[in-house]
Amino acid sequence: MVLPAAPTRFRSRDTEYRYRPDSELFYLTGVTEPEAVAGLVVGEEPRFTLFVRPRDPDAEFWAGPRMGVDRALSAFSPDDCHSVKELAQRLASLLDGGDRIFYRTRHGDGVGTFVSAALERARARGPRTGGGPRALVDPGEVLDDMRLIKDEQEIEALRKAVAISIAGQRAGARSLGGGVPERTVEAAV
């Protein structure tokens, strides 16, 4: 399964909207970093490989801190973690073992190009090797039901999130008053 992060949306040339992570990527990994890609392999030896943006002091000065490979390793505990710049060269070997690639093509993120190339290579080698992925499948076939039906741990996490949201909304309401700028209310929330 290949799960790319949601794309960053721009308000104008160099002004971004607040980033909203991809729901499926966040649900399975907790990753909220733009441009991240998770590779999940199931089977006898399940593997979680994560690709994230490398640290870049110049870019971070303007757009905020990046997780980087080292922090992503400790924060998300993947089996492997690499710079997203290595995705093209590493993705094919990651996808070689299965018979299907789960990938949602709705992202205009460039990852689809690498997934398609890996699928084509596997199809070309298939007659010689007898293996490799043969089909592209929407991950919603698996994830939609998983996200819909909650276990006790997920229900407790939702209760906690609701309590935090209520407290934030109340704090925002308490900060309201004449002449209070919107950013003050947002900070209270």
Report each predicted region and the residues it spans.
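A composition/biophysics-driven feature that prefers long, compositionally simple stretches
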Residues: 1-168
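Conserved short loop/turn motifs at secondary-structure junctions
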Residues: 145, 172-183
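Acidic, glycine-rich loop-and-beta core segments that form the ion-binding/anion-interacting portion
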Residues: 183-189
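Generic, well-ordered alpha-helical scaffold segments in large soluble proteins
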Residues: 161, 168-171, 175, 188
